[in-house]
């Protein structure tokens, strides 16, 4: 995955955007090297971004400024979100929010790019694929199938 140009580009879009949005809100921000996070049914490229917020910045300001990331909202943000609202026929609901915790001394969040909702005896699964210049439609559909199957695998385990 780390050698795949498309995966590297997707990851770079996200972490570069987050760092840009931290500017003005954080005293410092450090990005880790990309790593593979192996899970039972799928693997991810993972980077940690550790930031020390300015005293006048609260966690909610940070979250509002960062989300949605390009992983789920596209880039450039305003134009991409307008296009998503035009094209998608459904509400995204809980898909793609920040997942984590806030405490007095430290907070930690992740970009939640897959989610599921069990309601009224029905399971709704949400996932997406990064569409970039040069993306192959068949490969993107396969990626969606793989992601959904990994979620179903967790459900059945």
Predicted segments with their positions:
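Glycine-rich, small/acidic residue-mixed loop/short-helix segments
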Residues: 73-79, 83-157
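Contiguous alpha-helical scaffold segments within structured protein domains
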Residues: 1-85, 156
């Amino acid at each position: 995955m780390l050698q795949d140009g498309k995966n590297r580009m997707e990851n770079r879009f996200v972490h570069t955007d987050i760092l840009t949005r931290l500017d003005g809100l954080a005293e410092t921000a450090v990005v880790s090297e990309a790593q593979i996070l192996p899970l039972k049914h799928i693997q991810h490229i993972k980077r940690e971004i550790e930031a020390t917020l300015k005293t006048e910045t609260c966690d909610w300001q940070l979250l509002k400024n960062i989300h949605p990331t390009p992983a789920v909202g596209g880039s450039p943000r305003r134009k991409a979100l307008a296009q998503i609202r035009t094209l998608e026929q459904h509400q995204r609901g809980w898909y793609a929010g920040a997942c984590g915790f806030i405490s007095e001394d430290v907070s930690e969040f992740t970009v939640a790019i897959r989610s599921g909702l069990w309601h009224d005896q029905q399971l709704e699964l949400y996932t997406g694929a990064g569409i970039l210049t040069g993306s192959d439609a068949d490969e993107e559909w396969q990626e969606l199938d793989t992601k959904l199957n990994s979620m179903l695998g967790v459900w059945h385990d």
